[in-house]
């Protein structure tokens, strides 16, 4: 159910938090978008469409989750042509969505907020690393990340194109601890806090790959990696973090 927008009124802005189960970790961002849009159409909610020829659904997503990562804190803003009871809307979306991407929370938000992708600039991550080698341990990984931070920039390839990312602002903080041994493998649990900007976003897998190439982890091998995004926030100029579904930003 949809309706073409004729002007620029403040249509109800329904913000939905959803997860991306590990089973769908390798689902790309475009596939996530298409899956959500199909779920919205099946839900029967009166979504708004733009004025362009293609009549695209008016929906905005938070920053793309890297392929290979799961999440329990993704968001989209869906613009409706009429306000429905928030519980009714949430249940309709939940019923029409795959269980591995089911909505977790929903609320109507202030209409004049910036687009999600630009507004949510801080992320928190958990990574579980499994590797081999006597030097594969939390203290060595901590040394590797410290060396990279002092280096300032890491260079990597995305496809066949060289890329670089500056760590001074994008890598906010981290902690590493040794986890339970898994047979002959050693494991590390890593938490990361990152910041994105117009200059780019730091992907955990890129940082971890760069760390494995440092002297601190020489002679070790990373055998498997699981990454989970655990949170996203807006960062104010004074460093205060604002939740995407902050009560202060909700409409009653």
Where are these regions (language model features)?
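Ordered, amphipathic secondary-structure segments that act as subunit-interaction surfaces
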Residues: 72-126
